[in-house]
Each structure stands twice: as C-alpha cells, then as structure tokens.
C-alpha cells in the first residue's frame, strides 16, 4: 500500500477542500483517464483496491498510472475514549482529491477495455467520477476568422 517514507509532522490539520484541482487536470501518461467530479479524501486502501480491480480486469495488457498519492495523515481516538486529552493517534493516510483531478490513467489497451477497467475502479472509490480521453487536437480552439 502507498504510504509516505517520512513526514515532517505526524498529525496534520484537516484543511479545506474548496474549489478545483490546481494541477493534474490533463492526461499526461496514458490515453484514457478517470477524473474526479467531486472533492473527497481517498484512503490508501481505496487506491489499492481500485488498482487491483483495474489490473485484474486488464490481465497482462496495458499500463496503469496512479496520479494521486496519500500524503496526509488522519487521526482517530479509540472507541469509548472521552473527549479531551489531546489529539488521537494517526490512523491512516489519505490523498486529498479535488474535483477535476485525473486520478488514474490507462494506456496500451482499447477504449472499451479501458472504459470497463476504469468503471470497476470507480466502484471502489467514494466519489463520482467520469471517463476521459486524451484530446487529439494539440492547440485546442483557435480564434482565426
């Protein structure tokens, strides 16, 4: 599972998840991708479950790129512990995913195989997602009259 090798602070603030993702909004490595439609925390277990679902469906064909990494720790106090007496112990790791972020990419397979593999992966995630293709036009729109 994905965990950071070392961190500066073991216990982090929760933070806000306002707005869209700043980077990682375009497909960089593969031909097809899974884009987040809403913002959420994605745990390292959910990322691993999605990866396994994709790779098992694709068998030995294609390549998978994971574009998110769980670098934020979250804490939890034990069950039955009263309020107060400090922050709880670190319980796991999450990736902060904002809407518009490409989470997974697939290359080297046909579109219907990629679509089904990413659908299986999206079933393992707690957010709404959409299937995206790499845009064929390089320059985008032009203003030539």
Curated annotation (Swiss-Prot):
Molecular-function GO term, any one: tRNA binding
Domain of life: Bacteria
Keyword RNA-binding: yes
Keywords on record: Ribonucleoprotein, Ribosomal protein, RNA-binding, rRNA-binding, tRNA-binding
SUPFAM superfamilies noted in UniProt: Ribosomal protein L16p/L10e
GO biological process: translation
GO cellular component: cytosolic large ribosomal subunit
Subunit field text: Part of the 50S ribosomal subunit.
General function of this protein: Binds 23S rRNA and is also seen to make contacts with the A and possibly P site tRNAs.
NCBIfam families in the cross-refs: rplP_bact
Family, per entry: Belongs to the universal ribosomal protein uL16 family.
This protein's name: Large ribosomal subunit protein uL16
Organism of provenance: Lactobacillus gasseri (strain ATCC 33323 / DSM 20243 / BCRC 14619 / CIP 102991 / JCM 1131 / KCTC 3163 / NCIMB 11718 / NCTC 13722 / AM63)
């Amino acid at each position: 599972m994905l965990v950071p090798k070392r961190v500066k602070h073991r216990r982090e603030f929760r933070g806000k998840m306002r707005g869209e993702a700043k980077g990682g909004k375009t497909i960089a490595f593969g031909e097809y991708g899974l884009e987040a439609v809403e913002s959420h925390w994605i745990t390292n277990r959910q990322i691993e479950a999605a990866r396994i679902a994709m790779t098992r469906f694709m068998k030995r064909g294609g390549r998978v790129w994971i574009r998110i990494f769980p670098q934020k720790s979250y804490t939890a106090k034990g069950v039955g512990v009263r309020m107060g007496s400090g922050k709880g112990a670190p319980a796991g790791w999450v990736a902060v995913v904002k809407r518009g972020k490409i989470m997974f990419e697939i290359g080297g397979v046909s579109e219907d195989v990629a679509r089904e593999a990413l659908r299986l992966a999206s079933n393992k995630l707690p957010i709404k997602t959409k299937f995206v293709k790499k845009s064929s036009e390089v320059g985008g729109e032009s203003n030539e009259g």
